[in-house]
């Protein structure tokens, strides 16, 4: 009731009085109010407003470039030339305007080398102001990436290419190498570096400068894990449909002078920091990513590792109470834990530095940190791949027995921890592999009998991991699969790759699902990959598993054509070709389904691909050749060229053993008959020629006489 009373006439009169007082108070020059609204040390240059008529023209130009409906690259370049001519002398006004800044960014992306240098020169002496501005900072980032690409191109030029360019640009007497222009810009920023670190817009420019100077990969401005832009900026960039060109997502060759510039940048920034301010920056939402890069790159130019020792004590020192409380804050804070994780993962520190922090402040409470699912657990995951083997095994010994308790299905916690444990175990020669498998089954399928699976197995395994209830599975509103569903599906695929027991368990769960529900999974954009990854066959397959494989294939009966004509299901039908190895009857059944509705299959884009991959032309015209493909597949599957070695790799079927017995008996009888026939013929010849053994003895006897 108190809130409703405050909305009466008295409140209105009071608000009017406050507004009038604000009006009187604000009757000061605009320039002064602008200066007072910005922090000290932050430039706030006003470059003017874009005229309304010009604004309409530039709006239209921006939409034309966005649509990109030019007949050729020459037409587009001609349009860009005309827009740049119109924008000449107005570049600074345009980049600080919300709409026109998008146009300038597109022009920079499409500009040739000469145009790029021209724009760069127009920004000269104003780079600092542009870096601190909301809109121009984004334009500046794009310009820096294109400039880095041009510097690499100029470094790679031969003398002949340079001479040709000089002849082409004889009219341009003041043509300066891009490297010199870039260094001139770097000098502009040096007095403002400490202010840039924690500024909302300038910090992103500083990050990019550090990446270029260090010769590291320049990340995309739209990907979710980009170190270049903030989350809001990446979303906005996608909405305005500005796409990066080929200069992004790659590293560039840099000149030797850049190493000196990086050293000066590091020295300038470190000179303005002490331990207290450095630690404050490491947990600062905006400054922390910049400090991460400084710690990561300082090793290129500073053997003393100044930034590291500003934040942490020297490696020769023991436990320090102040440092201990700071590390504890890092381990419990979201920004701080991300900072610590980043410098561990990105080789930002020497191994002995990390080992010191681990032994002093983390080793005796590994399990407790692993239970902090929003911060501490990420540090443990990073340490699994950076510490010595002995320490890694110690962490595994601590966590593996409690793995089932650490994973939370409902809250979707620590799936990444299970992933990293599996990877660390594999690297260490499958260290405690069986225990990891037992813990995962204990968590996700507690009622499943791993050694002797039963027909009454429920769907608990895939339900606990994929959370099918409440997912987008079966939705008719064309809902996109969520990021959580992708994460869960990838985790299940990882388990199936890790051990075949998870594949068998997944088969039983598929068979326990209603057929309609299973087919919905095959049509789902994420869960279809789970089905596809589950359709694998072991080389040495037992009879029991082969029977289970046949039972799983029965689910697909009558569904093949629908799957083949679907963008997701078609991949599953393709996978069934290998999944039906040694099961020619099932392979023939699937091919017959496709052939029975050949017109429908051939009318579909995806169906035609399935038709080709299954060799259906041979099936319909030359079935003998199609069966030869099946035989060839069996030989290739076992990786042997002869039937003897192939059959010795697996348990032979009773019919195969019987056929071999009959063949052996037939061969033995033929040999006996052949011997008998040859003996009979030989005796007859001896009788006719009189050259038997007895006559030879008589002759020998007569000769002696």
UniProtKB/Swiss-Prot annotation:
Keywords: Nucleus, Repeat, Ribosome biogenesis, rRNA processing
Cysteine pairings via disulfide bonds: none
Residue stretches of biased makeup (Polar residues): 33-43
Region annotation Disordered: where it falls in the sequence: 1-43, 665-705
GO BP field: endonucleolytic cleavage in 5'-ETS of tricistronic rRNA transcript (SSU-rRNA, 5.8S rRNA, LSU-rRNA); endonucleolytic cleavage in ITS1 to separate SSU-rRNA from 5.8S rRNA and LSU-rRNA from tricistronic rRNA transcript (SSU-rRNA, 5.8S rRNA, LSU-rRNA); endonucleolytic cleavage to generate mature 5'-end of SSU-rRNA from (SSU-rRNA, 5.8S rRNA, LSU-rRNA); ribosomal small subunit export from nucleus
Per-repeat ranges for Pumilio: 86-121, 122-157, 188-224, 272-308, 321-359, 361-397, 512-549, 554-592
Biased composition (Basic and acidic residues): 15-27, 665-674
Stored SMART domains: Pumilio (SM00025)
Magnesium is among the record's keywords: no
Function noted in UniProt: RNA-binding nucleolar protein required for pre-rRNA processing. Involved in production of 18S rRNA and assembly of small ribosomal subunit.
Protein's name according to its UniProt entry: Nucleolar protein 9
């Amino acid at each position: 009731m108190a809130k409703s009373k405050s909305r009466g006439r008295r409140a209105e009169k009071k608000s009017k009085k406050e507004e009038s007082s604000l009006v009187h108070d604000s009757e000061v020059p605009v320039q002064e109010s602008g200066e007072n609204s910005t922090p000290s040390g932050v430039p706030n240059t006003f470059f003017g407003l874009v005229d309304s008529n010009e604004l309409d023209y530039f709006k239209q130009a921006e939409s034309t470039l966005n649509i990109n409906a030019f007949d050729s690259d020459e037409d587009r370049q001609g349009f860009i030339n005309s827009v740049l001519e119109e924008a000449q002398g107005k570049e600074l006004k345009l980049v600080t305007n919300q709409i026109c800044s998008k146009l300038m960014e597109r022009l920079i992306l499409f500009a040739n080398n000469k145009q790029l240098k021209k724009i760069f020169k127009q920004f000269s002496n104003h780079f600092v102001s542009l870096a601190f501005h909301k809109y121009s900072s984004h334009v500046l980032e794009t310009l820096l990436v294109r400039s880095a690409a041009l510097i690499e191109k100029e470094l790679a030029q031969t003398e002949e290419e340079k001479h040709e360019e000089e002849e082409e640009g004889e009219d341009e007497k003041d043509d300066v190498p891009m490297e010199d222009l870039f260094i001139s810009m770097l000098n502009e920023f040096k007095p403002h570096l400490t202010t840039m670190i924690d500024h909302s817009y300038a910090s992103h420019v500083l990050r990019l400068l550090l990446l270029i100077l260090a010769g590291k990969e320049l990340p995309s401005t739209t990907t979710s894990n980009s170190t270049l832009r903030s989350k809001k900026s990446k979303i906005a960039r996608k909405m305005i449909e500005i796409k990066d060109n080929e200069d992004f997502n790659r590293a560039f060759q840099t000149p030797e002078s850049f190493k000196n510039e990086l050293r000066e940048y590091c020295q300038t920034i470190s000179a303005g920091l002490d331990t207290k301010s450095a630690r404050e920056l490491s947990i600062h939402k905006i400054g922390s990513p910049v400090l991460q890069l400084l710690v990561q790159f300082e090793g290129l130019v500073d053997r003393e590792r100044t930034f590291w020792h500003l934040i942490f004590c020297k490696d020769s020192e023991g436990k320090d109470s102040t440092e201990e409380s700071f590390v504890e804050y890092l381990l419990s804070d979201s920004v701080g834990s991300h900072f610590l994780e980043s410098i561990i993962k990105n080789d930002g520190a020497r191994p002995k530095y990390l080992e010191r922090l681990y032994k002093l402040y983390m080793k005796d409470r590994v399990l407790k940190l692993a239970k902090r699912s929003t911060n501490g657990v990420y540090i443990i995951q990073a340490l699994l791949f950076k510490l010595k083997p002995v320490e890694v095994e110690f962490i595994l010994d601590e966590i593996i027995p409690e793995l089932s308790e650490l994973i939370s299905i409902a809250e979707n916690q620590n799936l990444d921890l299970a992933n990293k444990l599996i990877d660390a175990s594999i690297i260490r020669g499958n260290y405690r592999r069986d225990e990891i498998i037992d813990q995962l089954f204990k968590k996700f399928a507690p009622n499943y009998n791993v050694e002797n699976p039963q027909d009454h197995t429920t769907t608990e395994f895939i339900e606990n991991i994929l959370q099918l209830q409440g997912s987008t599975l079966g939705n008719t509103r064309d809902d996109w699969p969520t990021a959580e569903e992708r994460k869960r599906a990838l985790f299940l695929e990882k388990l199936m790759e890790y051990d075949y027991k998870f594949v068998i368990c997944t088969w039983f769960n598929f068979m326990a699902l209603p057929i309609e529900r299973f087919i919905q999974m095959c049509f789902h954009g994420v869960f279809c990959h789970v089905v596809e990854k589950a359709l694998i066959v072991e080389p040495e397959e037992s009879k029991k598993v082969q029977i289970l494989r046949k039972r799983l294939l029965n689910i697909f009966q009558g569904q093949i054509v629908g799957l083949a004509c679907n963008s997701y299901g078609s991949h599953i039908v393709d996978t069934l070709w290998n999944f039906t190895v040694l099961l020619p009857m099932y392979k023939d059944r699937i091919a017959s389904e496709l052939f029975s509705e050949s017109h429908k299959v051939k009318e579909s884009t995806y169906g035609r691909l399935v038709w080709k991959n299954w060799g259906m032309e041979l099936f319909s015209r030359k079935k003998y050749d199609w069966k030869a493909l099946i035989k060839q597949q069996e030989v290739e599957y076992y990786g042997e060229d002869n039937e003897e070695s192939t059959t010795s790799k697996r348990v032979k079927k009773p019919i195969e053993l019987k056929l071999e017995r009959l063949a052996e008996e037939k061969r033995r009888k033929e040999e006996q008959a052949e011997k008998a026939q040859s003996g009979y013929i030989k005796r007859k010849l001896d009788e006719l020629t009189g050259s038997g053994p007895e006559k030879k003895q008589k002759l020998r006897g007569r000769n002696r006489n």
